[in-house]
Amino acid sequence: MATSPDKINMEYYIGNKKENFAPINVYDDGEFTYFKMKRSFKDMPVVFMQEVDGNFTEVPVDVNDVTNGNNILKVRKVSKKIRFTVGKKTINIINQNYGR
């Protein structure tokens, strides 16, 4: 079932967009979070999402749309703060519409 357009949240801040593994944009449908990646991205980030208690937990990433050529990563969760990590590099992503 498709999500109606008024349910899509695209209010995300993406820090350090210059990194190769930084998403171009981020959006969610209230249940899943989607990360549109650059065509040139090579390093798969480890994705951490902030829990209600403030701690970050690594979450599984669905890469099905990457292998299909769409370059979209999907996480089965929505969170206020997200971290992409590759090696010692980290990108912080903030859901500016979380809880509204």
For the regions a language model picked out, list residue spans one by one.
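Short edge beta-strand/loop segments characteristic of extracellular beta-sandwich folds
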Residues: E31-K38
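Beta-strand-rich binding/interaction modules
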Residues: M44-F48
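Solvent-exposed beta-strand/loop surfaces of large extracellular or lumenal domains
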Residues: M49-G69
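Beta-sandwich interaction modules
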Residues: V66-S79
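Short, aromatic- and glycine-rich surface loops/edge beta-strands on solvent-exposed regions
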Residues: S79-T90
